[in-house]
Amino acid sequence: MKINRLFAIVALAVCAVTASAQYNMPTQTFTYDKPYAVEKIKAPKGKKVKNVILMIGDGMSLMHVYTAWTANRGKLWLENATATGLSKTWATNKLVTDSGSGGTSLATGVKTCYHAVGVDPEGKPLTSLVDVAKELGKDAGIAVTCRLWDATPCDFCCHNIDRDKEEELVGDYPASGVNFVFGGGAEKFFGRKDGRDIFNELRVKGYHVSRSLDDFFAYDTNSNIFAVPYDKDTPLPDERGDLLARASMKGIELMNRNKKGFFMMIEGSQLDDYGHFNQLDMLMKETLDFDQTIGKVMKWAAEDGETLVVVTADHETGGLTLVNGDKNEGRVECCFSTRDHSGAMVPVYAFGPGAEHFTGIYENTDVFKRIKQLLTNGVIK
């Protein structure tokens, strides 16, 4: 009897130590010292969609959003969304997805395998929202803060079974038909192993290739533009300022000249990086930079009246948990449960005509399907 009691005591002690080790994860604290004002944006009354702007926070979950809300003293531009939903992100061969598979589902409406970009599980190229827009006579563009050979921008313009085949992916851009591109990663466009000079190929296709910010922001003609001012990623948020917002608005300005409309994908790319690094301060700065870009885009969409804005994520990164904080001080205390992606559902927010079609719980492929219907018909019947 005493042996059984001793065994029970030891077992309970082991369980207690295990539980403590499991839940006593190290926390990080961040206080946002540059809080910004947020305005209430009145949603347009129109019902017909002419343009769609899809904004992807790479690795962004509900916890990222609420932590950023707390850091900015209890307000975000994102709160102007008039509809919210939840998206399931699984890949065909793996529950926890990546930006290749998750982004491809958003871009093409097809579930695919882990690491695949713009192709189905058998490697067959898929039709993306860029292709849909072009077939409708609309313009199409992308603006990102990552390298243009990263998965998310490639999901919309390129095709490969393996996202790590970066030079092959970049080689697909000249044939993509995309009208406006802004991002980093110039080093994969020239000096390549295959001898191709992708910048020259783009010029032959009629693109203006911009290698500096001054040239990019001064550009004011109707021909296509491919802007790659950085060899790798764009700079950190403290260094680049509101570059994502400015680049996005430049794309909107240029593509809005097409009377038939446009589709644009904008990505807050580096949220994912700092989720992987478990670096709370930089993660929050990236999330808040993305939110300020959302604000600029939503304000423009409200004035335009025919533009739907959809904000979502391809997956969650870092297993972020907000464990404490103070929204009056802008202080957040968080922990991370992984340095990789998690399998959490991700939020979907919508603003503008057609927003009501993005409520509920659904597959990430449904985001594509609903956007395609709205781009094609202006409404969902």
Locate each region found by the language model.
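N-terminal catalytic scaffold of extracellular/periplasmic and nuclease hydrolases
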Residues: 22-185, 189-191, 198-216, 316-381
